[in-house]
Amino acid sequence: MSALHQLSALNFLVIGLGAAFGAWTRWLLGLSLNPLFVALPLGTLAANVIGGYLVGVAVGIFHINTHFSLAWKLFAITGFLGGLTTFSTFSAEVVERLLAGQPAWAIGLASVHLAGSLTATYLGLLTVGATRIWA
């Protein structure tokens, strides 16, 4: 399917709905978790690690079960998980630590996000048995 054929009203709608639900989820995670440990914004970390896990699950499921429509893939991955995970907030929080003269915290924060998200994505693929596809 060409990119032009994917530009349908339904696809715009499902991406937008998914993104709204993902962003609301991220906002609620921030509200509930960020106050727990101010030095490490746990809401952003949770959003990125949970999103990493769920994208692994989704990619695995969609790869194994080819009967899912493009709309479901766009809703789940591009919409919901795109709205849930947040590279811009993560970047701002790391730079905030650097500007506060806390380079060790900045490096640690970046490392935890990267390692956590990549590990969670792999675990998501393992959950649905999708790693054997690429072996």
From Swiss-Prot:
<dbReference type="InterPro" id="IPR003691">
    <property type="entry name" value="FluC"/>
</dbReference>
<keyword id="KW-0406">Ion transport</keyword>
<keyword id="KW-0997">Cell inner membrane</keyword>
<keyword id="KW-0479">Metal-binding</keyword>
<feature type="binding site">
    <location>
        <position position="82"/>
    </location>
    <ligand>
        <name>Na(+)</name>
    </ligand>
</feature>
<comment type="similarity">
    <text>Belongs to the fluoride channel Fluc/FEX (TC 1.A.43) family.</text>
</comment>
<keyword id="KW-0812">Transmembrane</keyword>
<feature type="transmembrane region" description="Helical">
    <location>
        <begin position="42"/>
        <end position="62"/>
    </location>
</feature>
<protein>
    <recommendedName>
        <fullName>Fluoride-specific ion channel FluC</fullName>
    </recommendedName>
</protein>
<dbReference type="GO" id="GO:0005886">
    <property type="term" value="C:plasma membrane"/>
</dbReference>
<keyword id="KW-1003">Cell membrane</keyword>
<keyword id="KW-0813">Transport</keyword>
<feature type="transmembrane region" description="Helical">
    <location>
        <begin position="70"/>
        <end position="90"/>
    </location>
</feature>
<dbReference type="GO" id="GO:0062054">
    <property type="term" value="F:fluoride channel activity"/>
</dbReference>
<dbReference type="GO" id="GO:0046872">
    <property type="term" value="F:metal ion binding"/>
</dbReference>
<feature type="binding site">
    <location>
        <position position="85"/>
    </location>
    <ligand>
        <name>Na(+)</name>
    </ligand>
</feature>
<comment type="function">
    <text>Fluoride-specific ion channel. Important for reducing fluoride concentration in the cell, thus reducing its toxicity.</text>
</comment>
<keyword id="KW-1133">Transmembrane helix</keyword>
<feature type="transmembrane region" description="Helical">
    <location>
        <begin position="106"/>
        <end position="126"/>
    </location>
</feature>
<keyword id="KW-0472">Membrane</keyword>
<keyword id="KW-0915">Sodium</keyword>
<dbReference type="Pfam" id="PF02537">
    <property type="entry name" value="CRCB"/>
</dbReference>
<feature type="transmembrane region" description="Helical">
    <location>
        <begin position="12"/>
        <end position="32"/>
    </location>
</feature>
<keyword id="KW-0407">Ion channel</keyword>
<dbReference type="GO" id="GO:0140114">
    <property type="term" value="P:cellular detoxification of fluoride"/>
</dbReference>
